[in-house]
Design a protein with these regions (language model features):
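Acidic, low-complexity intrinsically disordered regions
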Residues: 1-215
Length: 215
């Protein structure tokens, strides 16, 4: 394992229901990346955008080389093929690690999944298949998976993926809610990069904001 190297994979919803939140999403993502550039250790970043289809805009790019996301990268359209996005991403990163030299394999891996609605368009992967993939990576390699969902019961949906409740959070799909989830993502990623446990506190502000405004 390569010490102090973290594999970070962001799987971000850009389906049509995200309309109106483009600038908030772009701003939140860019602020998070900028903060992570100042943290200790190396990191490879993959950013996967999904609607009906999956588009990879960063494929294991050194975090210091990541350019700010723009409206050319992130625009909304289509439905929610979440299972395909997650399944393909796990398969790709898993294969890279499998065939990498031991000294090049990242010490830590974290996937951050965001969606503002239910899966409704995947054609290649099923819940059962993705759940087995996630559980395999969690148990054998210690990969972390976070699940942030709007307009759904995030904990319930995450469980279908094999992601535990303490790694899932519901949020409001608006300006404030989007800002809060990117701050939470950044905190969790910082913990993983520093080899600290991801405690339930990573999502405290997300939970507080959701409950306060969920009336």
């Amino acid at each position: 394992m390569k010490k102090n190297l973290t594999e970070i994979v962001f799987i971000l919803d850009r389906s049509g229901s995200m309309a109106g939140l483009e600038d908030d999403t772009i701003g939140g993502f860019n602020a998070m990346i900028q903060k992570q550039k100042g943290e200790d250790g190396e990191a490879y970043v993959s950013t996967v955008l999904f609607d009906n289809h999956t588009e990879v805009i960063h494929d294991r790019v050194d975090i210091q080389q990541i350019q700010p996301m723009t409206r050319k990268d992130y625009y909304v359209r289509g439905c929610t093929a979440l299972l395909d996005a997650v399944g393909k991403s796990i398969h790709h990163i898993g294969n890279v690690h499998k065939y990498a030299r031991e000294e090049d394999r990242p010490e830590k891996t974290i996937f951050v999944i965001t969606t503002d609605g239910m899966e409704n368009a995947s054609r290649e992967y099923t819940y059962d298949r993705v759940k087995k993939m996630i559980q395999h990576e969690q148990e054998k390699y210690g990969w972390e998976f976070l699940f942030l969902g709007a307009n759904i019961d995030a904990a319930k949906e995450a469980a279908r993926f094999g992601i535990t409740e303490d790694r899932a959070a519901s949020y409001h799909a608006d300006h404030q809610g989007t800002a809060v989830i990117y701050e939470a993502m950044s905190e969790a990623v910082c913990n993983v990069r520093a080899s600290r446990p991801v405690s339930a506190d990573w999502k405290r502000r997300v939970d507080e904001d959701y409950k306060k405004r969920n009336k």
